[in-house]
């Protein structure tokens, strides 16, 4: 049984992750961490969740807090805090604003929960993962971004629905940036163990259109209902329970690269990794075709440039 802290627990994703985690058998306590001005909201969330948990005879401690000392003993600290992109705000603007929040929280985690694994969900997640790594001083395998895990689940869903096949038969993955430069690994996608390219020959399927839909998935949901909730929350909960239970699943998360894939170094990107409870995330080297390799390297350069600019901005603010 593990203690998990959710920083940004009153946000749309934060509160959904908190409730999902509270229902997991492997979680004994969830700290609903918030800013002081939002602590009443966090308390209200906990009261509401307790009522729901009682209906299912679930016993999980929910601790609303704005005190960093309550991070102590956390096995995992999830950072979801930050601003959301507003009209007229681009990814670069978002990165500069959220970097200050993430850096501050990462420093506090290092001080109060030095043995925890940091899981970053704040966007742009690949840049924010590097910022959290810098600020915490942790080993690179103990600072993990949610990366392309949700993107991979979305791609799996699209193929399953289009081909009318159970999603458990779809094995596919998205790597690279969680954003415009994501790289769907179509060359290694299989359906029931059969390469995707053989299905394409038999079924009319526009792969480029599916990829476009995948990249716009989040915006499509936001335009229709205002926010993405369940997909991100369940994807994040899946990552956390995988870390806690030590099941060694291979999931696509954002990690700091040192040449393991396509010779890319010094940047955080979504890559397939074996996750364990001690934070020993092991990156799996993979084979890609030329197109995928070039797209992955392009993603690396764009994220690297933005990351360095954000790093310089943080230095100027110190």
Label the model's feature ranges:
Residues 14-15:
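N-terminal Rossmann-fold NAD(P) dinucleotide-binding loop
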Residues 136-142, 151-318:
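C-terminal substrate-binding/catalytic lobe of Rossmann-fold NAD(P)-dependent dehydrogenases
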Residues 90-156:
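Rossmann-like NAD(P)(H) cofactor-binding subdomain of soluble oxidoreductases
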Residues 6-7, 32:
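Hydrophobic Val/Ile/Leu positions in short beta-strands of Rossmann-like dinucleotide-binding domains
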Residues 54-115:
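Rossmann-like NAD(P)-binding element
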Residues 1-4:
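Extreme N-terminal starter segment of soluble prokaryotic enzymes
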Residues 10:
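Conserved glycine-rich cofactor-binding loop
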Residues 33-74, 305-315:
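Conserved N-terminal Rossmann-fold NAD(P) cofactor-binding segment
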